[in-house]
Amino acid sequence: MDFGNETVLKATGITKKYGAAKALDKVSIEIKRGMIYGLIGENGAGKSTFMRTIMGLISIDEGSIELFGTTDLQAARRRMGQSIETPALYPELTARDNLRIQAANGGVSDREIEDLLKMMRLENTGKKKAKNFSLGMRQRLAIANALITNPEFLILDEPTNGMDPAGMAEMREIIQRLVKERGITVLLSSHLLDELSQIATHYGILHEGHLIKELSKEELAQESRQFIKIDTSATEQAVTVLDSLGYRDYFVQSSRVIQPFEGIDQVAAINQALVEAKVPVDGIHLVGQKLEDYFLQLTGGNPHV
């Protein structure tokens, strides 16, 4: 889907103070239509605070916010939906009745409600009350609530928090479908680095209220990509061995260096195969870093934040 180059959110120099402490310090973020922008940071980094300023739930002390190219934020926020922290649901009501209440003033038809339930995989919950839903079901219902007004921009704070791997995968699929099928732009946060790397197209790393780095998905992959470095005087023979092992993703950097990008946990086996084929190996070792290591390098924090 071609989303063009429209700016959905332009936050410039956002600062939020609580007494002498700065929860946000001159944070500037620009989000284009069609992006899934992921905020990464440990608890207390400022992720929720930033989202709340965009939604108008808390004021800012410095900076400016534009939504859809306008500073008329009251009108622009009608084009947004959000699910922040604990989902605000009616625990004694069913999924359908929760959505009907949300839809009461919006002219939303029962057909549209059924479509939302189906998209969120809640169509078969029947008379089951929301208080008896699993965490994943509650999160999906909260997103359905946020979609009632058919928003163009969706803000999700920790949408996979507390979920098991199956629930996380399901939530990823739903968010990606929203972007693909409805053209929705998404801002979401997480403290699970690996999880966010599987869904976002762009990233902002927050640390102690500062935006310390922005990257695209491709740039992040390059920063955290690992490979094996093989130093040999017989690159052609080494390539033949790699081919025989079934490896295809490698780069012949020079007449002496080959970089395989797969089999990174098989360094010893690759070395053994080269030696058995009488390929002279002057050096073989793993190069690069994992996503968690990259985050640690930037923040000095805990990778499992």
Predicted regions and their residues:
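ABC-family P-loop ATPase nucleotide-binding domain
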Residues: 1-15, 301-305
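ABC transporter nucleotide-binding domains
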Residues: 6-9, 16-188, 193-207, 211-213
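Generic beta-strand hydrophobic packing signal
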Residues: 12-14, 27, 250, 284
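Residues at or immediately preceding the N-termini of alpha-helices
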Residues: 73, 110, 217, 235, ...
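Generic structural signal for individual residues within well-ordered alpha-helical segments
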Residues: 77, 99-100, 114-117, 169, ...
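ABC transporter nucleotide-binding domain
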Residues: 172-261
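Short, charged/small-residue-rich alpha-helical element at the C-terminal edge
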Residues: 226-298, 305
